[in-house]
Design a protein with these regions (language model features):
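Short amphipathic alpha-helical heptad-repeat segments
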Residues: 6-13
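C-terminal functional module detector
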Residues: 10, 41-63, 67-85, 89-105, ...
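Charged, low-complexity interaction regions
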Residues: 18-31
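Short, flexible loop/turn segments at beta-strand junctions in immunoglobulin-like
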Residues: 108-110
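A metal-dependent hydrolase metal-coordination microenvironment
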Residues: 127, 150-279, 285-287, 292, ...
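Sec-exported extracytoplasmic/periplasmic mature domains
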Residues: 191-195, 331, 428
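Acidic, His- and aromatic-enriched active-site or binding-groove loops in soluble protein domains
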Residues: 222, 226, 301-310, 362-371, ...
Length: 462
């Protein structure tokens, strides 16, 4: 079991609870001690004859076939499948996230048993729950009819995701991330959650641009790239060229050099008609969070990602810090449009699922069979158990509901003019809002998002 990613997920939720309750939870076990304790307990369990096996040998399978539609028209939809209602209620995590084909069809092979499918197409559609049974070597056919419950498109709004990765970020194309999805799969994933536009922002290259621009069936593809700088990530939106931040090394790595490279690439993006954005400015890694010495020049960017889909939008997280900073920038008169991006590296959202099930299994063994580990571990195990019981239900709730692509939407007002440059211009001007579900548009005396309103006192004086 690879523990690093699991620990990072635990720490995200721990940080949130610490911020909410103003207490420290990891004072007795730091990151390394957590990993060492889990590895030790896993070996103790194995020595006692307990081995983790996600899928029992000889499992029998059947097939589920689904057809989704809006009225009588096929629709691309997201499908979440739980193995049964009891697991969902107990938060014992067992979830598959799938995406239908363009014609609304889905066929998937599943172990025999009882299931429930949750089918939706984003916040403007109803959610349909369909229970079904899988029988050995049989095909179970189900249907889901989705109803449109909101019509923001009719009022000039369009929804999209500005931060997503594909196979072009992987080692196959010179990248470092284990992403396997093609641009076509990414587009269907975005559409399954109600997106009408999207930016495919791979690392290190612009190789996806030609293929991404072909994804134009009821969808507006925006070309982009996420630029690595070694002290932050910059999103170039709407530029076809490969803008590169020249990372200085050795004695040449000075604050002035780093600062000037930020200025240069943002200027280049703007000159080429693009929009420069700072991504996840408070990320946990030094190489991916924005250099804290450079906030004085943040206006070289035109937008700022305050909601990153890899972490909850909750107190204490990188998103909460970015949101707070964005508000303080507004107070200083520095106006950047707030955006969100899923930062998806896996459209199926199953990065943690084997890990979460493994941790459930291990903690179940440890709590039921304390005899498997030496008494010298009692204090650490007791603390780990307390941490697990306090943090795990909250964390699983986030993974189940929110750890999927495009959870938070960018809604941009274009008045029906949905070409890439028109969408980017609307973002520049702040004609947008972000939401993870509630759809609220607001006007003050006929003025909506992004328009400067002059407040007057009772005498009519500004």
């Amino acid at each position: 079991m690879k523990f690093d990613k699991l620990i990072e997920l635990l720490k995200e939720m721990v940080t949130t609870i610490e911020a909410e309750e103003n207490q420290t939870l990891l004072e007795k076990l730091n990151r390394e001690e957590l990993i060492n304790t889990m590895q030790f307990l896993q070996r103790c369990a194995a020595q006692a004859g307990y081995y983790y096996n996600l899928q029992a040998p000889g499992s029998e399978f059947g097939t589920m076939k689904l057809q989704t539609a809006e009225n009588d028209d096929p629709i691309v939809a997201q499908v979440k499948i739980w193995d049964n209602k009891e697991h969902k209620i107990r938060t014992r995590f067992s979830l598959r996230r799938l995406v239908t084909e363009e014609d609304g069809s889905l066929s998937v092979k599943l172990p025999c048993g009882s299931y429930e499918a949750e089918v939706t197409c984003g916040p403007e559609y109803s959610t349909v729950l369909v229970p079904f049974e899988i029988t050995k070597d049989k095909v179970t056919t189900i249907k889901a009819r989705l109803a449109r419950i909101a019509h923001l498109t009719d009022h000039g709004w369009t929804a999209g995701d500005l931060h997503h990765h594909s196979i072009y970020s992987s080692p196959a194309y010179g990248g470092t991330d284990p992403v396997i999805e093609t641009p076509d799969q990414v587009c269907r994933s975005m559409k399954s959650l109600g997106m009408q536009f999207g930016a495919l922002s791979d690392h290190h290259n612009v190789l996806n641009h030609e293929e991404w621009q072909r994804q134009n069936n009821n969808f507006t593809p925006i070309i982009s790239k996420e630029i690595s700088t070694s002290n932050g990530h910059v999103l170039q939106l709407g530029v076809d060229d490969d803008v590169i931040y020249e990372i200085p090394k050795g004695k040449e790595r000075t604050t002035d050099k780093l600062r000037n490279e930020f200025i240069r690439i943002c200027s280049e993006i703007r000159k080429k008609g693009g929009l420069p954005q700072v991504n996840h400015p408070f990320d946990v890694s030094f190489s991916t969070r924005y250099n804290s010495e450079f906030w004085d020049m943040v206006e070289i960017f035109e937008s700022m990602e305050i909601g990153n889909g890899t972490t909850p939008f909750a107190a204490g997280t990188i998103n909460a810090k970015a949101f707070k900073k964005w508000l303080s920038l507004l107070d200083e008169g520095k106006r950047l449009t707030a955006t969100t991006g899923s930062d998806t590296h896996n459209i199926y959202g199953d990065d943690y699922f084997g890990m979460t099930e493994w941790l459930d299994w291990m903690m179940d063994i440890v709590m039921k069979h304390p005899e498997i580990y030496p008494v010298q571990m009692n204090e650490k195990v007791a603390y780990l158990t307390w941490l697990y019981n306090k943090v795990w239900p909250r964390l699983l709730s986030w993974v189940e509901q929110s750890n999927t692509p495009s959870t938070i939407h960018n809604y941009v007002y274009t008045n029906g003019k949905n070409q890439p440059q028109e969408i980017l211009q609307a973002i520049r001007e702040g004609h947008s809002f972000i939401s993870n579900g509630p759809l609220v548009t607001a006007e003050v005396d006929g003025i909506s998002y992004g328009v400067k309103a002059v407040l007057k006192d009772r005498t009519g004086t500004p």
